[in-house]
């Protein structure tokens, strides 16, 4: 196999197309979310003006500052998912761009009702969005971060590796993008969709690697 692996991905924001793609998926899929603050740059500019120029109560200031400083890593009440990527091999992925609440709800409903086995890396991050929006979790899943932490790593916690980018750099190189691209304004950029698709394929490849290792050890 040649490295780095070139990922083949396709993307859509069309609900009909997304539904058709999801119906055709195999039984084991790797999934990943991209997220962003739910507030636009324009909305944040207005928040900044209010914070700098208005007399606010302590509670008003606290809430407004929390909204102003929010990013894709913030609480689900302050964020939205912008992409769902799904990989079913080490190089094939689809990316669904979630640019409205109808698409987001469709995605959440799919993830908590499908019987396909879902592979996630660092599932607590993604699952907090699923749980917050549905009150449920996927039916069948496993977490490659937890599995890596349990099976592959050094007993010394200061020497172990669980980051997907670290674990899979040998196969995909450095595919990270700037944190500034995780915004509502940047969600349509080709680089963001490529990043999202690579995340899903890297997760699937890590899942395959772990399966091979555990088979060797007869685990």
Can you say where each PLM-predicted feature lies in the sequence?
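Non-catalytic alpha-helical coupling and interface elements of nucleotide-dependent molecular machines
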Residues: 152, 169-173, 208-212
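Conserved RNase H-like, two-metal-ion catalytic cores of nucleic-acid enzymes
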Residues: 1-166, 170
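Short N-terminal secondary-structure initiator segments
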Residues: 157, 162, 170-186
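Mixed-charge, glycine-rich, non-catalytic linkers/tails in nucleic-acid processing enzymes
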Residues: 135-144, 177, 182-219
């Amino acid at each position: 196999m040649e490295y780095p692996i070139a990922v083949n991905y396709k993307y859509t924001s069309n609900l009909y197309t997304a539904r058709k793609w999801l119906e055709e998926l195999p039984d084991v899929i790797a999934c990943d979310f991209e997220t962003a603050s739910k507030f636009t740059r324009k909305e944040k500019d207005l928040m900044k003006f209010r914070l700098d120029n208005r007399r606010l109560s302590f509670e008003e200031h606290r809430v407004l500052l929390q909204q102003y400083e929010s990013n894709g890593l913030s609480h689900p009440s302050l964020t939205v998912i912008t992409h769902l990527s799904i990989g079913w091999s080490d190089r094939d992925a689809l990316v669904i761009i979630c640019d409205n609440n109808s698409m987001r709800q469709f995605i959440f409903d799919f993830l908590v009702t499908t019987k396909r086995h879902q592979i996630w890396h660092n599932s607590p991050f993604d699952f907090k969005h699923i749980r917050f929006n549905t009150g449920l979790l996927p039916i069948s899943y496993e977490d490659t971060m937890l599995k890596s932490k349990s099976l592959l790593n050094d007993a010394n916690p200061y020497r172990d590796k669980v980051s997907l980018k670290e674990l899979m750099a040998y196969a995909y190189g450095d595919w990270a993008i700037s944190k500034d691209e995780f915004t509502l304004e940047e969600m349509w950029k080709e680089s963001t969709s490529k990043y999202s698709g690579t995340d899903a394929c890297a997760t699937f490849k890590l899942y395959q690697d772990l399966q091979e290792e555990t088979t060797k050890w007869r685990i």
